[in-house]
Amino acid sequence: MRAMKLKIALFVTLLAVPTLTAQTQVVRIHAATILDGTGKTLKNATVVVQGSKITSIETGSPANVSYELGQLTIVPGLIDVHAHVGWHFDKNGRYANRPGTPAQEILYSAENAYTTLMAGFTTIQSPGQANDVELREGIARGVFPGPRILTSIRQINERSGTADEIRQKVRQLKTDGADVIKIFASASIRDGGKQTMTDEQLNAVCGEANAQGMRTMVHAHSPESIKASVNAGCQQIEHGVFATDDVLKLMADKGVYFDPNVGVVLQNYLKNRDKYNGIGNYNDEGFAYMEKGLGLNKTMIQKAVNTPKLMMVLGTDAVAGAHGHNADEIVERVRQGGQKPMDAIISATSLAAKSMRLEKQIGTLAAGYEADLVGLEGDPLTDITAVTRVAFVMKGGKVYKFTDGTARAK
């Protein structure tokens, strides 16, 4: 036990890279270009920060600039609305589908959280892991560095009971501190993606969540499961590999957020096939479904991008092997789907924040917002891959990443 405590202490110490502690003095960050997260572009501008908040954005480069980012592009801290921060490979390099000790699991989660933060993601939403609450609170207290975390803690699916039992589970999740309710309305893509929850169950879970003032995010691949979830009053649909024009339009008409995952998760599974194969439904049939899903996703994202008023938010479904590659989702939505680069950035900033009901706190660079800033090497409006080249990360007024050679501190 003492050895484990020493390991934990050492790990946290190593993770705690030197940061600029959020203080009361004014910090000024200047760059050639600033994208504010709402569609506006500012040239030769400075973000002024005091404590954890942005106090103003000024034109020009003041003499007393604290961080000169030169030709970097500043964007708001990126947001991933669907990341499995606790998923990891075990010591043998295989997917750890059975949890280890609590100490081991929190260390893996902390490592993934740190990796995600270094990739420019300052807020993520985790759809349910046993230690999510501890991780969320530890990061919030500054025990170790990581993105701001929202979590569903657990999930609700077709095995969660009767309508009344499901309503009770929703109330319990609220009591336990869940930020969102995660629902499985369909099977996995590896099992064909058909609807699994009944309409009655979906009406119960989304109805109770709405009554409790809680958000819902729904795993739904098939058109039937998407339609049933939207009609039940759910707020956000995940995946949607088999989404048709009709259900895409339904989501747009009902103001439901859509989080298609086309650039990270399936690619990661196929890249790491040997690490997953033979575990549960990670078998030959399952991988065949996922290979087919790549083409289906391309067709789907093209339709989604061209659906008027559809609110697409940025989520990756990042699992073991994918942490730190979250921005690839932004790149592939532009490449495969034809999404405009500015729209893709908005989906990962202000719109993602709105989907979390945090639109007045994060996702936008403006006075009064949390000082979450990311510096990118290049201009993502002309080269979307710039979102994968992160040289500067500030979260809540603290600098966690500052790459020498691309910018300088004064």
Residue ranges with predicted function:
Residues 13-21:
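Hydrophobic h-region of N-terminal signal peptides that target proteins for export
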Residues 34, 38-75:
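Histidine-rich, glycine-flanked metal-binding segment
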Residues 72-141, 200, 224, 229-232:
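Metal-associated gating/positioning segment near the N- to mid-region
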Residues 94-107, 152-168, 194, 215:
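Active-site mouth loops of central-metabolism enzymes
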Residues 105-113, 161-173, 221-225:
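Short, acidic/polar
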Residues 108-132, 146-156, 178-189, 215, ...:
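Divalent metal-dependent hydrolysis catalytic cores, especially in the metallo-beta-lactamase
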Residues 159, 184, 190-295, 318-320, ...:
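Active-site core of metal-dependent hydrolases
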Residues 211, 282, 293-380:
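His/Asp/Glu-enriched, well-ordered alpha-helical/loop segment
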